[in-house]
Amino acid sequence: MAQLDTQKIISTIANSKKTTPVKVYLKGKLSELHFPKSVHAFIGKHTGTVIGDWAEIKPILKKAKLDDYYVETAGRNTGVPLLDIKAANARIEPGAIIRDQVLIGDNAVIMMGAIINIGAEIGAGTMIDMGAVLGGRAIVGKHCHIGAGTVLAGVVEPPSAKPVTIGDHVMIGANAVVLEGTTVGEGAVIAAGAVVINDVPAHTVVAGVPAKVIKQVNDQTEAKTVLLDELRKL
């Protein structure tokens, strides 16, 4: 997968309009309320809901004569929206947080609580397990498994920094940490809880803190770390 342009990512964060996205539930006489087109307004006779930027909604509410209203705030001065996942050809479970400018390959699986930062790339058929974190610009190849609670460190700044790169067919156990600038070779296995600070050769098994090569991947290793295509069907 091609790495996303670093300068474009930085420009997006720096120059995007900062907003405070809210959802507001209204009760009262609502017929006289008028919101700008940028606000999604679903108004009935006595109750309604509006969704938009608090900076646009707040002045209108201050002038309105309402019986009550309640505000749900999704963020404050946010610069990067969440990715629109409706068109993704992947399985994305509720509770995953995926920012814009993330690339997701076909039949990838992103489990509950996973956090995927801007510029990250996930290859086809790769599973990102529960609570895993992919930092900015982290690259994961095809048909990998990134274990629950694992962290792939991100690098958005400095822009010249090398991102974490995970090759195809890599298995990473739960709660491992892969530091920025590290490359993990194709078919490698990283044990649960390992902290990877150096590049991992292809088809090796690493474990420990810091992670060290303990053996080559063999038939026994492959049997224990086999990935199931059945879990990646849509």
From Swiss-Prot:
It catalyses: (S)-2,3,4,5-tetrahydrodipicolinate + acetyl-CoA + H2O = L-2-acetamido-6-oxoheptanedioate + CoA. GO terms for molecular function: tetrahydrodipicolinate N-acetyltransferase activity. GO terms for biological process: diaminopimelate biosynthetic process; lysine biosynthetic process via diaminopimelate. HAMAP family: DapH. Belongs to the transferase hexapeptide repeat family. DapH subfamily. The gene is dapH. Pfam families: DapH_N, Hexapep, Hexapep_2. This is 2,3,4,5-tetrahydropyridine-2,6-dicarboxylate N-acetyltransferase.
